[in-house]
Amino acid sequence: MTTDQLPAELERVHMVGIGGAGMSGIARILLDRGGLVSGSDAKESRGIHALRARGAQIRIGHDASSLDLLPGGPTAVITTHAAIPKTNPELVEARRRGIPVILRPAVLAKLMDGRTTLMVTGTHGKTTTTSMLIVALQHCGRDPSFAVGGEMGEAGTNAHHGSGDCFVAEADESDGSLLEYTPDVAVVTNIETDHLDFYGSADAYVAVFDAFVERLAPGGALVVCVDDPGAAALARRTAELGIRVLRYGSGSHGQAPSGQPLAATLVSWQQQGTEAVAQIRLAGEQQHPLVMRLSVPGRHMALNAMGALLAAIEIGAPTEAVLDGLAGFEGVRRRFELVGTAGGPAPSSTVRVFDDYAHHPTEIAATLAAVRTLLEQSGGGRSIAVFQPHLYSRTKAFAEEFGRALDAADEVFVLDVYGAREQPLAGVSGASVAEHVSVPVRYLPDFSAAAEQVAAAAAPGDVIVTMGAGDVTLLGPEIVTALRVRANRGAPGALR
């Protein structure tokens, strides 16, 4: 039975770092369910303006007095340990007053109580797969509540309190917080070593997925992509525990190449510009393969959609309605998002600029593969990759792998490391990645000069893609502007 009534401790909350993707989503749901919300963050943002419009009291900067923004003060203070230090003055003041400090994952778990819970995790593709599942269920009339790590194109938001009986959310594995949840359906897209700054070893990272699956509710199911070796191994271990496993991936006659049975098989896939058409077969279906159309390119997107399809079917959504919903999925901000174009109307006379959140070698490889197919279908041109490494620890661990992945581009620009929460490491910079790139590459430590240099390298028909989890997303519009300026003044290079 669902209820809109909030737990008493969440009726009046103060959120430290309220503008973050995950925190702002929690704030939206709390406000929609009648809660009072105050918060603070380091800087203004579009998300903060939207929360203020909904009634949240938000202060820029961190100060102990922010705990008095709500009449009577908060019943709890919510934070995220990944980005907010324990020395934050608002957290210090909360502890002094005896106000409970609750981490975001624990709050999300409380908000899910009483609903059928579907959670998506994995090293790559979490946000996109979660968003696909949400859109599919919305199309089926289920109106799910949801919390996702990116802004969905259709909804223009990252969270929603729905009237339906299910809750869809992204489960973040980066800090072990996915162990707060007890899902009815868990989707695992892939497992590949990451976040060694937190886990310390590959074995510890892999183990958290096993622990997550073991938290499935009685009668729950694991939906897992067995094209990925790490996820396929998880499927085998999970089946040995007696948990129901629904596998999806490439194969024939209902089996993956490994011999594992498939609940959904990717029979064929074809990219058509920035769209894709896949043929899939569901277990037990004897008729011709089903056609799955997507408005987002890349074989990896087809696999993500298959995971969403199986999860939706698992809770009773009609197959054809789910496929119709997936066909209307417009993507997520920063997932192969078209930023802009400069030049003529034909692909051969224009430069297209995309932005992508890719910040792991495998993600970069998938994004550049989609770019390559796009170029092949539009008559040629070059791919230009602009990559900003994220975190010093990740850059140190994967510098060589980043270089190999970037070799799929025709030309590469590497920016300096976006450190986020980390302090610099001696000898680690964007140059650490650039030295492992074998195609033409330039290391650009000066972010402010990057847009002009990238624009100068482009020619009609080229595709530029900015990649990374930091502020490289700001660069795309600057590149588009620089391209247009160069074209207007007849500068050599881009659009002569």
From Swiss-Prot:
It is found in: Cytoplasm. Transmembrane segments: none annotated. Pathway: Cell wall biogenesis; peptidoglycan biosynthesis. It comes from the Bacteria. It holds the Pfam family Mur_ligase_C. It catalyses: UDP-N-acetyl-alpha-D-muramate + L-alanine + ATP = UDP-N-acetyl-alpha-D-muramoyl-L-alanine + ADP + phosphate + H(+). HAMAP family: MurC. Belongs to the MurCDEF family. Cell wall formation. This is UDP-N-acetylmuramate--L-alanine ligase. It comes from Mycolicibacterium paratuberculosis (strain ATCC BAA-968 / K-10).
